[in-house]
């Protein structure tokens, strides 16, 4: 038994002997909450609505006085135990603290970034990864995580695209729900569970220009049909809490948006969980120009039913005064306190505030590392593979590895890794060296650039000399972890620094060149794409990047990832996304008037024009849902059970998937629909279902999808959710651009 666990056990035994009149296991939860609330002073009630950072200078005093309900960013188990003892043993009522942390994609074992997890299209694996993260975090005293982030975005300039699940409502909802299930397990009371906090409610990913914290001007139809559906999914999965957003939505800051929070979330959706502000977003309403002072900010937040204020001081300073002024009632505070206390009871903090008395699994244990490795493998997307240069041939005798991201243990972890450590990370270079040695391959390495942003190539001649002697070049390109994440947006998403020049230099030799790209967003590299024989997009893969990438390059496993977001050819195409509208002048390759083909002084005409860019056309570099494999697959025998359906019926779609190649591999079968005519124009395609299936060569699998026709609806011009009768197309395929098309009709 570890020293920490022994201390926790002794603390638990001491606490179990304390007399707490409001704890009675025979009472139902509501009675326990009401009994405790009845004993609380107004100061103690307001204290439950206050969350402070772990380094707050008056932390101990506030805890002892009952002035804090939650502490974030404290993960030292000894310190967590110390402050929890202050709350339980020194404050008047002994109400335990709720310890919170941003556990975004792993705790000590770092998983691929969430955008990469979405590229796996494997819900079971992502849920398992969230279980790993929850278990490790809970072992250090954390019982509340500010994740998953389900801010749907169509703009890769936005740095926080790395934290979400891409551009599609279904993917964001399904993967968000998988994380909720993984965090919260079978019960919040499970000591290895942590409360999930889907964020940011809402439209944070709609930031103008992809610039973080920027204004979100969004139509009602996009808000209700694109942005909000993922939140419905995570709340159906039982998410215990949610967090507001920094942005304003059509002129009202999200943290004070009563129509969105009180009227929709609370009253219409009946969400009974805790709503927490983002960091200082309550007092930032004054900076927005929406409130005059912190007192008015506290009023707006309370009217919007914000239960807990993170970091700023409006609640603790002004709520008592607002009650005295008659602006709010004490009942408003009581309602918020009840929700917070209920969560603490559900987490078992009153029964055992000091943690579980049994041993937790070790951080970074083999099972956890294997989950991280598998996820890194399944999330990598093979974008190009000319002449089947991958997997690497057994005939290769010499390899040269080039690029700073081949050996960047910190950067491979990605954004938001508070508790990950670079010394635990295994880099691609380390794993490639080990594999090359085992296979008798000579391997040379050149960093070439100090960082991904460096503008000068180091050792050009030495690189060229080794490339000339090599059978193949492995380039590692991309971006450092600091270039994505919160407040790290980019106007230019090209490969940074001299990376394009590095590709061009290496390609002049004429040897096969394979690029592995590690990044927190889609990056643009069309200029050098023709020079690359293969491109493996590995995102920021986490702790086990090295073993995962080495296995992929050498063919131990086949890539099976699919893009959860559209890759533009040029930043000027943004926003570009698969589920766009058709417009009245849809473009085709035949109607694309190319810039270089326009005659001099040709007259301007409006006849026959279509929606495209003269220089970059209308198509992306790589479409949503796209991803290659070392094998090949055939989808056949696509059928619909019944071509005429009533609203509420199940749309049953089946297909036969066959592995027609020579590698064991997984394929993601995707189902899309399109409503031909509606009371609002409808997207050209919308993802409705998907399955990932692993098959050996020559094996087949019958796949069946059941889609509820109620899910095919949208909000009409009167903002009523409707499923309209009419003709629909349906596609079953392997990306948003390729599939077998059938039709069905919804009748009255």
What are the language-model segments listed below?
Residues 12-15:
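Repetitive helical segments and hydrophobic/amphipathic motifs
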Residues 740-744:
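Edge beta-strands of extracellular beta-sandwich domains
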Residues 17-716, 722-736, 747:
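Glycoside hydrolase catalytic-domain context in secreted enzymes
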Residues 2-10:
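Sec-dependent signal peptide recognition
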């Amino acid at each position: 038994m570890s020293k920490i666990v022994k201390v926790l056990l002794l603390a638990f035994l001491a606490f179990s002997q304390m007399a707490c009149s409001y704890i009675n296991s025979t009472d139902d939860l509501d009675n326990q909450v009401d009994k405790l609330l009845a004993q609380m002073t107004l100061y103690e009630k307001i204290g439950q609505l206050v969350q402070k950072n772990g380094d707050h200078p008056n932390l101990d005093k506030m805890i002892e006085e009952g002035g804090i309900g939650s502490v974030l960013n404290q993960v030292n188990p000894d310190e967590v135990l110390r402050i929890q003892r202050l709350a339980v043993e020194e404050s008047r009522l002994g109400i335990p603290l709720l310890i919170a942390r941003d556990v975004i994609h792993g705790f000590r074992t770092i998983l691929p970034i969430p955008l990469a997890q979405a590229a796996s299209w494997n819900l079971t694996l992502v849920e398992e990864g969230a279980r790993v993260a929850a278990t490790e975090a809970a072992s250090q005293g954390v019982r509340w995580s500010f994740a998953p982030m389900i801010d749907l975005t169509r703009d890769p300039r936005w740095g926080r695209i790395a934290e979400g699940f891409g551009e599609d409502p279904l993917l964001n909802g399904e993967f968000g729900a998988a994380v909720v299930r993984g965090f919260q397990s079978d019960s919040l009371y499970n000591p290895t569970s942590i409360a999930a906090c889907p964020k940011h409610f809402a439209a944070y990913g709609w930031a103008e220009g992809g610039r973080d914290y920027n204004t979100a001007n969004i139509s009602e139809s996009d808000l209700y049909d694109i942005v909000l559906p993922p939140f419905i999914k995570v709340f159906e999965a039982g998410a215990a809490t949610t967090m507001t957003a920094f942005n304003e939505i059509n002129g009202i800051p999200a943290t004070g948006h009563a129509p969105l929070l009180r009227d929709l979330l609370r009253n219409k959706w009946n969400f009974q969980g805790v709503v927490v502000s983002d960091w200082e977003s309550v007092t930032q309403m004054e900076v927005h120009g929406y409130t005059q002072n912190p007192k008015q900010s506290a009023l707006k937040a309370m009217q919007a039913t914000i239960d807990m204020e993170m970091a700023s001081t409006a609640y603790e300073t002004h709520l008592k005064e607002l009650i005295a002024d008659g602006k709010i009632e004490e009942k408003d505070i009581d309602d918020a306190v009840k929700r917070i206390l209920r969560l603490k009871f559900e987490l078992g903090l009153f029964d055992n505030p000091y943690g579980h008395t049994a041993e937790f699994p070790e951080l970074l244990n083999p099972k956890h590392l294997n989950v991280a490795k598998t996820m890194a493998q399944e999330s990598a997307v093979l974008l190009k593979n000319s002449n089947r240069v991958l997997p690497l041939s057994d005939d290769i005798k010499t390899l040269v590895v080039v690029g700073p991201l081949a050996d960047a243990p910190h950067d491979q972890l990605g954004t938001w890794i508070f508790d990950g450590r670079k010394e635990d990370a295994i880099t691609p270079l380390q794993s490639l060296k080990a594999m090359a040695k085992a296979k008798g391959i000579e391997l040379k390495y050149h960093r070439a650039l100090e960082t991904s942003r460096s503008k000068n190539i180091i050792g050009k001649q030495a690189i060229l000399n080794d490339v000339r002697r090599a059978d193949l070049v492995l380039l590692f390109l991309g971006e450092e972890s600091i270039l994505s994440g919160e407040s790290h947006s980019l106007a230019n998403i090209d490969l940074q620094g001299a990376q394009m020049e590095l590709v061009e230099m290496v390609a002049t030799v004429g040897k096969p060149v394979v690029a592995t790209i590690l990044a927190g967003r889609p990056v643009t590299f069309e200029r050098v794409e023709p020079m690359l024989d293969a491109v493996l997009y590995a995102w920021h893969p986490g702790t086990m990047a090295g073993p995962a990438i080495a296995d992929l390059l050498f063919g131990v496993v086949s890539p099976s990832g699919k893009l959860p977001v559209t890759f533009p050819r040029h930043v000027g195409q943004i926003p570009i996304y698969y589920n766009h509208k058709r417009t009245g002048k849809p473009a085709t390759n035949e109607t694309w008037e190319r810039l270089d083909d326009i005659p001099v002084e040709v007259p301007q005409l409006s006849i026959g024009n279509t929606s495209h860019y003269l220089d970059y056309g209308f198509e992306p570099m790589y479409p949503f849902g796209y991803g290659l494999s070392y094998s090949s697959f055939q989808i056949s025998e696509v059928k619909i059970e019944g071509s005429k359906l009533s609203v509420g019926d199940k749309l049953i779609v089946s297909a036969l998937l066959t592995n027609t190649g020579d590698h064991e591999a997984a394929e993601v079968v995707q189902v899309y629909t399109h409503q031909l005519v509606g009371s609002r124009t409808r997207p050209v395609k919308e993802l409705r279902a998907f399955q990932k299936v692993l098959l050996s060569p020559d094996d087949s699998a019958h796949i069946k999808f059941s889609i509820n026709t109620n899910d095919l609806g949208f909000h009409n011009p009167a903002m009523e959710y409707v499923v309209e009768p009419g003709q629909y197309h349906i596609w079953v395929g392997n990306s948003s651009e390729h599939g077998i098309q059938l039709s069905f009709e919804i009748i009255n």
